[in-house]
């Protein structure tokens, strides 16, 4: 089949990485997958022209509101994948909620990353009950073997001679829902006590206004650094070399950065929100914090307790192997896409 796949494709963001992985799964099954950025289209009529020009027989959208709404009414069957902010944020706005409900009426299937995301969607849109499937994200990490960690530290203006250096890495696009400033003050205070701990915030500048605020705050915070986005392989190499990966988001669908850290055998400290708590079991596969002070307390504990670190790393790696298999994800999407074969009247 010739498939149109609409997603939000800001480079090096979670949704873009997911979209590329799903496209690879579908192409491996022999489909032609035309991946387009939903933000490049203003109206369904532009999509109608694209469907005609590309001779698309079916479609898929990642993110119910940004992608899904553009696929309505074209008389080609489509499926949708929940992105995270669609269920966690957009569903709270009446107008967007109604639009997404209509998208779900027309979609042949919908994929949620977690059981809790599926349950939230079913509460919002009860009519979609029978068509929501759960498929967690499949994880495959590819760290760049040639990556130079010392050069990275130099670029980050981190004192490499600091004895027993501990780098905490927060990977996120600079936008409010990721709350990158949540830990900055508390971390900075800790750095002043212990100059060998650093927080590195790494990711693309998504929201320009908010980015300015982040830069201004980081500039005056001792022990906190801000680094722009980088290719996936280099990012995985940074993760592999850091002490721990941090997530401080206000809401999450399913953080690929957390799962990739687990796969690369690096401990995870995550804010205690539903999307994170679905993957991180406290003191088993990672550590969950509810405020900045608790984060610092847990981070200190992790630094001083190698046995805890080892246990978390072993359990995290096993969790990803068991529940985030790339092959299982491939099989699921290749099966679901068959629901789009046949006439629109099915």
Curated annotation (Swiss-Prot):
Its recorded name reads Glycosyltransferase 1 domain-containing protein 1
Output the Gene Ontology terms for molecular function: glycosyltransferase activity
Record the organism.
Pongo abelii
SUPFAM superfamilies reported in the protein's UniProt record: UDP-Glycosyltransferase/glycogen phosphorylase
* InterPro entries for the chain: Glyco_trans_1, Glycosyltransferase_G1
Where is this protein found? Secreted
Q: Encoded by which gene? A: GLT1D1
Keywords attached to this entry: Glycosyltransferase, Secreted, Signal, Transferase
According to the record, the signal peptide region is 1-16
The residues that cross the membrane are none
Q: What is the lineage of its organism?
A: Eukaryota, Metazoa, Chordata, Craniata, Vertebrata
Could you tell me which Pfam families the record lists for this protein?
Glycos_transf_1
Query: Which family, according to UniProt?
Result: Belongs to the glycosyltransferase group 1 family. Glycosyltransferase 4 subfamily.
Q: List the GO cellular component terms.
A: extracellular region
């Amino acid at each position: 089949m010739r498939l149109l796949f609409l997603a939000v494709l800001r480079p090096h963001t979670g949704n873009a990485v997911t979209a590329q992985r799903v496209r690879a799964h579908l192409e491996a099954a022999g489909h032609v997958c035309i991946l387009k950025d939903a933000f490049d289209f203003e109206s369904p009529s532009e999509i109608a022209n694209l469907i005609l020009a590309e001779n698309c027989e079916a479609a898929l959208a990642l993110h119910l509101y940004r992608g899904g709404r553009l696929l309505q009414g074209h008389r080609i069957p489509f499926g949708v994948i929940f992105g995270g902010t669609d269920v966690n944020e957009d569903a709270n706005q009446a107008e967007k909620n109604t639009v997404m409900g209509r998208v779900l009426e027309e979609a042949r299937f919908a994929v949620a990353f977690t059981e809790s995301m599926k349950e939230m969607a079913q509460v919002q849109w009860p009519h979609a009950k029978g068509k929501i499937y759960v498929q967690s994200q499949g994880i495959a990490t590819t760290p760049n073997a040639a990556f130079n960690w010392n050069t990275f530290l130099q670029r980050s203006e981190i004192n490499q001679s600091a004895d027993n250096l501990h780098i905490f890495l927060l990977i996120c696009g600079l936008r409010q829902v990721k709350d990158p400033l949540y830990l900055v003050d508390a971390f900075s205070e800790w750095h002043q006590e212990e100059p060998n701990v650093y927080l590195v915030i790494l990711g693309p500048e998504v929201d320009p206004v908010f980015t300015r605020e982040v830069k201004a705050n980081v500039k005056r915070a001792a022990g906190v650094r801000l680094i722009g986005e980088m290719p996936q392989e280099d990012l995985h190499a940074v993760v592999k070399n850091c002490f721990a990966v941090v997530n401080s988001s206000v809401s999450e669908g399913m953080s690929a950065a957390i799962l990739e850290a687990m796969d690369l055998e690096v401990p995870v400290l995550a804010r205690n929100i539903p999307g994170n708590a679905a993957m991180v079991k406290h003191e088993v596969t990672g550590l969950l914090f509810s405020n900045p002070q608790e984060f610092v307390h847990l981070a200190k504990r992790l630094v001083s307790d190698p046995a805890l670190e080892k246990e978390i790393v072993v359990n995290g790696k096993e969790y990803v192997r068991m529940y985030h298999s790339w092959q299982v994800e491939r099989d699921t999407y290749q099966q679901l896409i068959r629901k789009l074969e046949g006439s629109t009247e099915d």
